[in-house]
Design a protein with these regions (language model features):
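S-adenosyl-L-methionine-dependent methyltransferase catalytic core, i.e., the SAM/SAH-binding region
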Residues: 1-67, 79-313
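Short Gly/Ser/Thr- and charged-rich N-terminal loops/segments
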Residues: 71-77
């Protein structure tokens, strides 16, 4: 939904914007082009490997990358008297939940637009060494930042059965969470679950035979639940929505693309409260969804929902 996102963000020429989930810079490339040669783009990602790939992609834009950004004005724009050698794109590792600190470190007071494309990128899914996907056999990791936190293997091999059930039920919305948690505990008593295939096979054995005939792989919800827990995705999102909204200048917009009901519900409720209690105007009364054509080109987009809010004061 890149076209719709750019239209709703309404980035001004020469403005300043943030891609809070940089990934492979698909959205960032379009944002940089919309901002023009005098604009500034800040790209953030928790995954350092994504930053390297994004830098390669953004090299096609006629904008310098990775020099320190200059101080911002009180209105959130950049100093109009910039040195012509200064960067227009700044990429850094971090989380959008800490955007206030990131902007402060760059001496940027506020921005014109922020995009959050939640979930996991194809780049991460397709790397078997990262352990996000069950279609490959790889280490059961799932960390967006491999240098921090516990892995999915740590969770499935150490948590109590009741804790695993809670995670799989709440974050995966998996109705057979109890059976799956019991199967995990039984399997790890025989041998530690260390690979994606071991976990997927364990889940399959726990499920009724008829349950394996659905549209999605039977292990999808369990993998989603563990990934959300490993990366604290909902906590990061809840904190990040507040931080991002407060980082907008007057008239600035925050666009969020979510991929499952837990994320979308959180975004919907937060935007609603920002509209009532803060200076927010929700621009999408109903979430925008991908067109049939886009779903055909990118099957992952079939579950995407986009919501946008504007800071009006």
């Amino acid at each position: 939904m890149p076209k719709e996102a750019l239209e709703l963000l309404r980035l001004p020429q020469g403005g300043t914007a943030v891609d809070g989930t940089l990934g492979l810079a698909g959205h960032s490339l379009l944002m940089a082009q919309a901002l023009g040669p005098q604009g500034h783009l800040i790209g953030i990602d928790r995954d350092n490997a994504s930053l390297g790939q994004a830098k390669i992609k953004l090299a096609s834009v006629d904008l310098k990358i990775d020099c320190p950004l200059p101080p911002g004005s009180q209105q959130g724009g950049m100093n109009p008297n910039l040195d012509k050698n200064c960067s227009r794109i700044h990429l850094l590792q971090g989380s959008f939940s800490e955007l206030d600190k990131i902007l402060a470190s760059l001496k940027v007071s506020a921005v014109d637009g922020i995009l959050l494309d939640l979930g996991i990128s194809s780049f991460q899914l397709d790397d078997e060494a990262r352990g996000f996907a069950f279609r490959f056999e790889g280490p059961l990791d799932m960390r967006m930042d491999p240098s921090q936190g516990v892995s999915a293997a740590d969770l499935v091999n150490t948590l109590k059965e009741v804790q695993l059930e809670k995670i799989i039920w709440e974050f995966g919305e998996e109705r057979f969470a109890r059976r799956i948690a019991a199967a995990i505990v039984m399997q790890r008593a025989k041998a530690k679950i260390t690979t994606t295939k071991m976990l997927a096979d364990t889940v399959l054995r726990a499920l009724p035979k008829g349950y394996t005939r659905g549209r999605i792989h039977p292990a999808t919800r369990t993998f989603q639940a563990l990934r959300i827990e490993v990366n604290q995705e909902l906590e990061v999102l809840a904190q990040g929505l507040d931080v991002c909204f407060k980082s907008l200048k007057e008239g600035g917009r925050l666009c969020v693309i979510s991929f499952h009901s837990l994320e979308d519900r959180l975004v919907k409720n937060k935007f609603k409260s920002l509209g009532f209690e803060e200076d927010g105007l929700v621009l999408t009364k109903r979430p925008l969804v991908a067109t049939d054509e886009e779903c055909a080109d990118n099957p992952r987009s079939r579950s995407a929902k986009m919501r946008v809010i504007e800071r009006i004061r």
